Amino acid sequence: LEFKKIGNEKWSNFCDNKLVFIPSVTTGISYRYAPWGNPEWPRIERNPQQFKERLEFELKYLDKNYRILFITEFNNFFEEALVEPDSKYGFGMLLALKEVLEKYNI
């Protein structure tokens, strides 16, 4: 999350009340079919617990006037970046999302 924190802080500072920064979160991806990318980039593993941690992290960057958070993929089957139920985690991603939204009353 350190990599994401640095980027979010730069964008948040850049916006300085003139633009709205809308953070985004991913469930993570499977690298099985998507081996490309820079090997130095941090891997974004996919599981409900890490998705939940990323959600809670991104909520810190919500604009107080526009409480919007993008989920970058809802059903990207190619990279297995999906929120909807699947054979590996069942309803795990949706339950993680529900838990965080209820915890923060969103």
Give the predicted meaning of each segment.
Residues 12-15, 98-102:
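Surface-exposed amphipathic alpha-helices with a cationic face
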Residues 1-50, 61:
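Aromatic-lined glycan-binding groove of carbohydrate-active enzymes
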Residues 22, 44-88, 93, 100-104:
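Substrate-binding cleft of secreted/luminal carbohydrate-active enzymes
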